[in-house]
Swiss-Prot record:
Subcellular location, record wording: Cytoplasm
Gene: xseB
Homology family: Belongs to the XseB family.
Top-tier EC class: hydrolase
Region listing for Disordered, in residue ranges: 1-26
GO-annotated cellular components: cytoplasm; exodeoxyribonuclease VII complex
Protein name, as recorded: Exodeoxyribonuclease 7 small subunit
Subunit structure as annotated in this protein's UniProt entry: Heterooligomer composed of large and small subunits.
């Protein structure tokens, strides 16, 4: 359960019918995907269409990474509250 707070569902494969069975992606994996996207976006030979598609994908990765970071912070705050009560 605890690990689920820090993972998001990876994009399902084309043949995957059930998103619940999709593997989870960690915060670090999202950040790595963002780093790769930034590297590719810096390619002067990247077409406008490919650049826009990559940008949209990168923004989705960013949102998911931010959600994981927020979940981690909320869990941290919860633990701090429990420590103060003890």
């Amino acid at each position: 359960m605890q690990d689920e707070l820090f993972e998001t569902e990876k994009a399902p494969q084309k043949n995957t019918k059930n998103a619940k069975n999709a593997p989870k992606k960690s915060f670090e994996e999202h950040v790595h995907s963002l780093e790769q996207a930034i590297d590719r976006l810096n390619d002067p030979n990247l077409s406008l269409k490919d650049g826009m598609d990559l940008y949209k994908t990168a923004m989705q990765e960013l949102v998911l990474a931010q959600k994981l970071l927020e979940n981690a912070y909320l869990e941290y705050e919860k633990l701090q509250t429990l420590d103060k009560k003890a």
